[in-house]
Amino acid sequence: ALAGAGHAIVGITSGSDDERASAVLPGVPVLDTQEVVRRAELVILAVPSAELPALVSGIAELGGWQIGQLVLHTDPAQGIEVLRPAAERGAIPLAVHPAITFTGTSIDLRQLQAGFAAVTAPAAVLPIAQALAVEMGCEPVVIAEADRAAYADAIATATEFSRSIIGQSTSRLRDIGVENPGGFLSALVQSTVERALRDASDPPPLV
């Protein structure tokens, strides 16, 4: 998404699915972490939450972070505190979480265009974080540092609970002989979720 907004991608690190990454970002070199950090003006850290603190501090210990460099992570549960080792070396910490379920395919670009992003950053650079969210295609929503855990809990509830309930429902339908339980429930679940989202978006009635 950022490439489409005019950003030049200087490199990506090797991950769990290099083939898929190459398909989505053709021609972008795969480099080691230190080399990506050395070349980039904006570093995006999209790693599991448990790995983020060690990654940030490890790069700091190797002297990788640069003054004025933008460092953005996409973890829903953490704000900018986890980026303190980078900030102490002059980097600008940003936390931007696009509220979509990533597939690792071009479908993600379409989802981003209709999505929102939770944004946390120091007040002086909050407009930068908001602008990057917009360039991804998202509408930015500011989340306070102290509220990131509650935000992550809300996101986890919406995604994991939905998967669990649908899994239970499809299993019961399959047990009674429904051959395509996912297809059977598709329209019902989508319309129910859309109705619930509309109800949640409506302003409360005046008393």
Regions found by a protein language model. Name each.
Residues 200-207:
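C-terminal active-site/capping subdomain that shapes the small-molecule cofactor and substrate pocket
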Residues 14-19, 76-78, 123-124:
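Short, polar loop motifs at secondary-structure junctions
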Residues 14, 98, 145:
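Active-site donor-binding loop signature of nucleotide-sugar glycosyltransferases
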Residues 9-15, 71-74, 119:
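Short, hydrophobic beta-strand segments that form beta-sheet elements in well-ordered domains
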Residues 23-25, 29-107:
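Rossmann-like NAD(P)(H) cofactor-binding subdomain of soluble oxidoreductases
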Residues 1-38:
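NAD(P)+-binding Rossmann beta1-loop-alpha1 motif at the extreme N-terminus of oxidoreductases
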Residues 5, 20, 24, 86, ...:
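Internal alpha-helical scaffold of NAD(P)-dependent oxidoreductase catalytic cores
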